[in-house]
């Protein structure tokens, strides 16, 4: 009482201090605050109106919270999780009937918990979960009937436990065994049922040293034969201890015997010297027994068996779920003795109990409706006795989420249908792809055939065009009089031969090979040897064909002669190379250039081509006829050679290139027909005339030199003497003609690319269009033949013609005399 008085006085002093300092933070709670808003104490007891739940407006830094004497009915984790600093919590004298499992798990600093004078019915492990620092636990004056053996396992630091004034009948021997710091355990005013099940707890209690020494207030209330016995034998009516009685009656197998049933009493009286059958205690000896162990009366009093609660424990009410639906449930309740007590089915919702129905049958099915999914519903079987409600067993129901409707299960026939459909689709795709592939391949073949036909047609047309270009004058003027024989003319009376390409430029005028269209090779050595006709050499490769054997028989004599002069040809080629090398070696300085003489064939070819190969006889005549037909309308012009002129290196180089090109161009037509010595006319100078002709040809731009890029500037030819008188034997003006503008078809036959642009792909020459367009695969074939060196494609007559063209009068006669000697020696 003194302690309570001092506590009340302290509360009054604290309240007065708050009123004086203005520390009243809320109208419903008295707060004692520290620095920076820290709250030490919050007194919320006896609130008007009383609290029905833990208030949330209190600062979370609170250390001491007092909510006693309100109407709080439940303790939830959500309402206490904010108060992490809480060390003292007073919930005394409320209406708490439900504590959520883990409700105090956020108060790991809590040391004092007061829950006295409430309506708790049982104590479980989950209620005290997380209270590792708890030291004082007050649960007095509740309705606790069951204390689980694991209730205090998470509270190893408990020093004081108060479970007095409850309804505890049984306690397990291991309930308080793990509490090493326990010094006070108040269990008085509980209706203990003294049976063999309580023997283990009584042994622990006898060994425990209770600081309060309240043994006289712990008594047995049932069974009636042991009513009034003290748990430890210290009482007002003698020294009767239930511990000694149970130790004398109960054995190690007492729990198994109690499950089977109560022991049968001994029949008859016990005789001295003979032991009664178990389970009575051993027979008394002659020695006097202790006062607390002797029975009243004489020794012939029969032993009375102690009734136990084993049958009652087995006969507890049972509740189980029978059926669950979307919004309802059916439960089954079994009662051992429905008429011994009044049983009801209660629904607990946050410690608020509501009666569902009264239970009056030994087994009854109850349907629960208007339930929601994913919601916990707790139902308990409660009995009422002497105005008190006893909770026997509970059941929690949670309706699951509505299951989704199951999808249709495919039948075996449906699965087979799906499989066949998939296989059919795959087979159809294969057929479609095959058809597409067949169509594409067929179309490709048709395109290839069309390309081949077009190439053949183009080749035929080109062949015809080339023939017309080369032999057009013969077709147009077949009655043209041949050139009359006569002596060689002087320079002033000689007509000019059209401009011809050089020998080194022969390769670029060959037709590019193709897989479909044959191409021609002009002036090659094999042409001379085999004697192919000119029509075959226009659009075919210069290689011997299958009919070459017949041609060899006809030209065997001439071929042998040509073989004999191979050495002369090689010497001529060497001479050409030496001339080119010596010409390129001149870079600057005054240079005197002697223009080479120009050669003209003025005699008829029918009588002057005894030493020519068959391939050169007709072509030479055609070129001369074409030349004369074009020159007929051209004005005459004389040209003189320039010597001793001083020019810059660039101008000299440009003129030298022009001279080389002019000489090469003049050599083209002489190769076609190499006449005898008496049919060659020397025209001096020729380089100036050829330069003027090339310069004017480029100005006309009629595909005469169709190649990209710039050309070296050629200086104009110096003025020459007046043109010589015409040659009467030819019936036309015998003079050097200016380059005339010929008709386009004929002009294209003479227009070739410059040899310095061999590598360029663009060309407007009609001879280059003889090949068919090649596909991309044919262009990159590794087996394509590469161009050979220029010396390999130079014909024998080619070199000889060049040497004859640039030779002077004496040299020309020497060459021809040597040629005749070789021929005569070969014939002999």
Curated annotation (Swiss-Prot):
InterPro entries: Cys-rich_flank_reg_C (IPR000483), ELFN_Fn3 (IPR055106), Leu-rich_rpt (IPR001611), Leu-rich_rpt_typical-subtyp (IPR003591), LRR_dom_sf (IPR032675), LRR_TM_domain-containing (IPR050541). Its main location: membrane. Residues 529-541, 696-705 have a biased composition (Basic and acidic residues). Disulfide bonds: none annotated. The modification Phosphoserine is found at residues 461, 645. Glycans are attached at residues 59, 85, 90, 122, 210, 376. Residues 274-285, 713-727 have a biased composition (Pro residues). Keywords: Cell projection, Glycoprotein, Leucine-rich repeat, Membrane, Phosphoprotein, Protein phosphatase inhibitor, Repeat, Signal, Transmembrane, Transmembrane helix. It is found in: Membrane; Cell projection, Dendrite. The chain crosses the membrane at residues 419-439. Residues 28-418 are extracellular. GO terms for molecular function: protein phosphatase inhibitor activity. PROSITE patterns: LRR. Residues 440-828 are cytoplasmic. GO terms for cellular component: axon terminus; dendrite; excitatory synapse; extracellular matrix; extracellular space; glutamatergic synapse; postsynaptic density membrane. It is a single-pass type I membrane protein. LRR repeats lie at residues 61-82, 85-106, 109-130, 133-154, 157-178, 318-342. It comes from the Eukaryota. Postsynaptic protein that regulates circuit dynamics in the central nervous system by modulating the temporal dynamics of interneuron recruitment. Specifically present in excitatory synapses onto oriens-lacunosum molecular (OLM) interneurons and acts as a regulator of presynaptic release probability to direct the formation of highly facilitating pyramidal-OLM synapses. Inhibits phosphatase activity of protein phosphatase 1 (PP1) complexes. This is Protein ELFN1. It comes from Homo sapiens (Human). The gene is ELFN1.
């Amino acid at each position: 009482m003194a302690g309570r008085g001092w506590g009340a006085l302290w509360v009054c002093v604290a309240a007065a201090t708050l009123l004086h300092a203005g520390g009243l933070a809320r109208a419903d709670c008295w707060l004692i605050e520290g620095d920076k808003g820290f709250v030490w104490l919050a007194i919320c007891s006896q609130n008007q109106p009383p609290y029905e739940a833990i208030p949330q407006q209190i600062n979370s830094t609170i250390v001491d919270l007092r909510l006693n004497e309100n109407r709080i009915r439940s303790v939830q984790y959500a309402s206490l999780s904010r108060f992490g600093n809480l060390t003292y919590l007073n919930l005394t004298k409320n209406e708490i009937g439900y504590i959520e499992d883990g409700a105090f798990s956020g108060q790991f600093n809590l040391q004092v918990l007061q829950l006295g004078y409430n309506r708790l019915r049982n104590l479980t492990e989950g209620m005290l979960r997380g209270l590792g620092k708890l030291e004082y636990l007050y649960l007095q004056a509740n309705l606790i009937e069951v204390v689980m053996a694991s209730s205090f396992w998470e509270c190893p630091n408990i020093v004081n436990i108060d479970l007095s004034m409850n309804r505890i009948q049984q306690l397990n021997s291991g309930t308080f065994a793990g509490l090493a710091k326990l010094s006070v355990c108040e269990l008085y005013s509980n209706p203990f049922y003294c049976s063999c099940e309580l023997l283990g707890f009584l042994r622990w209690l006898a060994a425990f040293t209770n600081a309060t020494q309240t043994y006289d207030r712990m008594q047995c209330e049932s069974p009636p034969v042991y009513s009034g016995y003290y748990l430890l034998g210290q009482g007002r009516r003698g020294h009767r201890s239930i511990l000694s009685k149970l130790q004398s009656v109960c054995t190690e197998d007492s729990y198994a015997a109690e499950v089977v049933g109560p022991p049968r009493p001994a029949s008859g009286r016990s005789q001295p010297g003979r032991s009664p059958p178990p389970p009575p205690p051993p027979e008394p000896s002659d020695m006097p027994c202790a006062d607390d162990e002797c029975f009243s009366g004489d020794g012939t009093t029969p032993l009375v068996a102690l009734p136990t609660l084993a049958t009652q424990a087995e006969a507890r009410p049972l509740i189980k779920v029978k059926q669950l639906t979307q919004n309802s449930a059916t439960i089954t309740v079994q009662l051992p003795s429905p008429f011994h007590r009044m049983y009801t089915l209660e629904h607990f919702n946050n410690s608020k109990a509501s009666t569902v129905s009264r239970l009056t049958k030994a087994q009854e099915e109850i349907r629960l409706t208007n339930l929601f999914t994913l919601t916990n519903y707790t139902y308990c079987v409660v009995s009422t006795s002497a105005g008190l409600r006893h909770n026997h067993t509970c059941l929690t129901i949670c309706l699951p989420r509505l299951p989704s409707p199951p999808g249709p299960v495919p039948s075996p026939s449906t699965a087979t249908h799906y499989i066949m459909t998939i296989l059919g689709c795959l087979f159809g795709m294969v057929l479609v792809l095959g058809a597409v592939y067949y169509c594409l391949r067929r179309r490709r073949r048709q395109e290839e055939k069309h390309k081949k036909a077009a190439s053949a047609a183009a080749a035929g047309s080109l062949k015809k065009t080339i023939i017309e270009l080369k032999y057009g004058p013969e077709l147009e003027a077949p009655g043209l009089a041949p050139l009359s024989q006569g002596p060689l003319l002087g320079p002033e009376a000689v007509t000019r031969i059209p401009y011809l390409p050089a020998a080194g430029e022969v390769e670029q005028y060959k037709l590019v090979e193709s897989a479909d269209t044959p191409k021609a090779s002009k002036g090659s050595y094999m042409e001379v040897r085999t004697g192919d006709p000119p029509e075959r050499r226009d659009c075919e490769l210069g290689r011997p064909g299958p009919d070459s054997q017949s041609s060899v028989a006809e030209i065997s004599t001439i071929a042998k002669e040509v073989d004999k002069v191979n050495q002369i040809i090689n010497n001529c080629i060497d001479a050409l190379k030496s001339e080119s090398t010596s010409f390129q070696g001149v870079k600057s300085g005054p240079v005197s250039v002697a223009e080479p003489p120009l050669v003209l064939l003025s005699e008829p070819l029918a009588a002057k081509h005894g030493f020519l190969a068959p391939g050169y006889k007709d072509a030479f005549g055609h070129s001369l006829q074409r030349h004369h037909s074009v020159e007929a309308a051209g004005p005459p012009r004389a040209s003189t050679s320039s010597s001793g002129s001083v020019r810059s290196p660039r101008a000299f180089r440009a003129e030298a290139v022009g001279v080389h090109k002019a000489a090469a161009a003049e050599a083209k037509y002489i190769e076609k027909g190499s006449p005898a010595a008496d049919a060659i006319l020397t025209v001096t100078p020729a380089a100036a005339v050829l330069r003027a002709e090339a310069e004017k040809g480029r100005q006309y731009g009629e595909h005469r030199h169709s190649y990209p890029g710039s050309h070296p500037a050629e200086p104009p030819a110096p003025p020459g003497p007046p043109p010589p008188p015409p040659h009467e034997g030819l019936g036309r003006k015998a003079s050097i003609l200016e380059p005339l503008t010929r008709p386009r078809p004929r002009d294209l036959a003479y227009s070739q690319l410059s040899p310095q642009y061999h590598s360029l792909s663009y060309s407007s020459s009609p001879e280059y269009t003889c090949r068919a367009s090649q596909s991309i695969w044919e262009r990159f074939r590794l087996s394509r033949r590469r161009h050979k060196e220029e010396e390999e494609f130079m014909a024998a007559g080619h070199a000889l013609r060049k040497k004859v063209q640039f030779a002077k009068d004496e040299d020309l006669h020497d060459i021809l005399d040597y040629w005749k000697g070789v021929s005569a020696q070969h014939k002999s």
